[in-house]
């Protein structure tokens, strides 16, 4: 069996308890078609194949692909794609019916682009591709996905993710659950993508506001956004929305960000 490679951020999940938590969180039924990112040695893959209609696993490591083909050679409901998931064109490379759920222990070093590919982007609205996304990720990222407004860890990722999906923390996962043990703690999260359109007039404008608004966390929102919106007009909008003039970006909820975006859009002010 190939050894884990640092350049691929590979850590093999060895905890059966965590494996059961992942499977339970996905609520897999016999009709489900699963997309798995980074199957590694196939520990999770085996459980998915036992419960789902089909599993498509995407793996970049050539040696692991060779091992996976040997292990699951007799599984008719298993498809292995040897490529970088970030380069996968689901519609072009997979046949109908396409996967409806994602269940994966993903490489932590590319978590952000994976989330963008799975959930989409605020500035590029699209109908959700997947019903459910269950991921084993770094706990620091998981905590931000489910963070509450006003907390120190609530940031742009929190707003974007919660705008695009219902985010749930399923369970923490200690480093000892892996071999080799990573230097960080992990967690299982379940993301349920929200159908578009969300109630915002201009998604591109909201995306810009978030990027600029969270650019300097110590500054008040009025100062961060002054390059986009006249300070007096912004103050008036904040007052109308019952948002403190001293508010910082992390103090606003997703709903408040949507309301602010609509209020200060150039067509409205």
UniProtKB/Swiss-Prot annotation:
The record ties this protein, via Gene3D superfamilies, to: Ribosomal RNA adenine dimethylase-like, domain 2 (1.10.8.100), Vaccinia Virus protein VP39 (3.40.50.150)
Cross-referenced SMART domains, in alphabetical order? rADc
Q: Which InterPro entries does UniProt cross-reference here? A: KsgA/Erm, rRNA_Ade_diMease-like_C, rRNA_Ade_Mease_Trfase_CS, rRNA_Ade_methylase_Trfase_N, rRNA_adenine_dimethylase, SAM-dependent_MTases_sf
UniProt-listed Pfam families: RrnaAD
Q: What is the protein named? A: Ribosomal RNA small subunit methyltransferase A
**Entry's localization field:** Cytoplasm
This molecule's function is given as: Specifically dimethylates two adjacent adenosines (A1518 and A1519) in the loop of a conserved hairpin near the 3'-end of 16S rRNA in the 30S particle. May play a critical role in biogenesis of 30S subunits.
Its source organism is: Acaryochloris marina (strain MBIC 11017)
Q: Which residues bind S-adenosyl-L-methionine?
A: 11, 13, 38, 59, 84, 105
Origin: domain of life: Bacteria
Which reaction does this chain catalyze? adenosine(1518)/adenosine(1519) in 16S rRNA + 4 S-adenosyl-L-methionine = N(6)-dimethyladenosine(1518)/N(6)-dimethyladenosine(1519) in 16S rRNA + 4 S-adenosyl-L-homocysteine + 4 H(+)
Where is it mostly found? cytoplasm
State if Acyltransferase is listed as a keyword: no
What cellular component GO annotations does this protein have?
Answer: cytosol
Keywords of the record, alphabetical order, are:
Cytoplasm, Methyltransferase, RNA-binding, rRNA processing, S-adenosyl-L-methionine, Transferase
